[in-house]
Amino acid sequence: MTNSCDRPLITPLEPPNASFIHISVLSQETIAGLNIIPGGHYLDATVGSGGHSRLILATFPDVRITAIDRDSQAIAAAASNLAELGSERLKFWQGNFADYPGKIAEFSGIIADLGVSSPQFDFPERGFSFRHEGALDMRMDQTQSLTAGEIINQWSETALADLFYQYGEERRSRSMAKHIVQQRPFKTTTQLAEAIAQTVPPKYRYGRIHPATRVFQALRIAVNEELSSLERFLDQAPQWLQPGGRIGIISFHSLEDRIVKYRFRDSSWLTVMTKKPIIPQREEQLKNPRSRSAKLRLAERHLV
């Protein structure tokens, strides 16, 4: 397999999935925060189906976008959704945003929405959701080898417990890992979710927050190396900004938000613009419940 650092900017070849539609969160706040300028070149590091990119391209007719995603289905969907705004204004790069070979002062602004796209949750075969029966997959880049099934069925009890605690912040990590090892192998998401539910008192098994929520988060983070990728990306991305350019990162859980907060604060390239993160207005939360945990942080590259 070719190293993703060597991948050229691509023309998407995979046909778009008509149902790959994702509602971007904090859209207006993000666009306002980036302060889009005429003729600007922007990096959408997690393009998804293209929601944020569409708003950026709509601001001025000469704005350009370089769009990244690990998911080939997302790249195809974004290319289709954004084509009417001018394909010559768009370049796509498939891979991990931490591996993008950016250049010093290449971009007027950078946006990354770290949430899992709604279609990834809603397509059972992707294995991200415990609410739909599917294989234990969870790969954003489906060319990689490690899956959630491999972790669940092959890792030791101690390794699983540590994973659930560190990446899921799950207080019952030890008992859950022990039960999983006793009951494995698991083939489907719903099998695993039901096994996890059996480790908590009956009154907590089917409440508003499913007992498997944090375990599934931990597995997804591990499969996709999400936190280490975010750290590597934030170590590089500020240098890719032009002086006065801005970077906005939307996170969805405390582990991500903590990394963004301290990477922004400690960067010698950036001035933090958001002392506290921006969160969705109540109206947006009601329209899109998945936006409830979103947090936007913004920073600006120093002028000199």
From Swiss-Prot:
SUPFAM superfamilies in the record, alphabetically? Putative methyltransferase TM0872, insert domain, S-adenosyl-L-methionine-dependent methyltransferases
Q: What class of enzyme is it?
A: transferase
Instruction: List GO BP terms, alphabetically.
Output: rRNA base methylation
Recorded catalytic activity of this chain's protein = cytidine(1402) in 16S rRNA + S-adenosyl-L-methionine = N(4)-methylcytidine(1402) in 16S rRNA + S-adenosyl-L-homocysteine + H(+)
Where found in the cell?
Answer: Cytoplasm
**Sequence positions that bind S-adenosyl-L-methionine:** G50, G51, H52, D69, F97, D113, Q120
Q: What is the role of this chain?
A: Specifically methylates the N4 position of cytidine in position 1402 (C1402) of 16S rRNA.
- Protein family: Belongs to the methyltransferase superfamily. RsmH family.
The protein here is known as Ribosomal RNA small subunit methyltransferase H
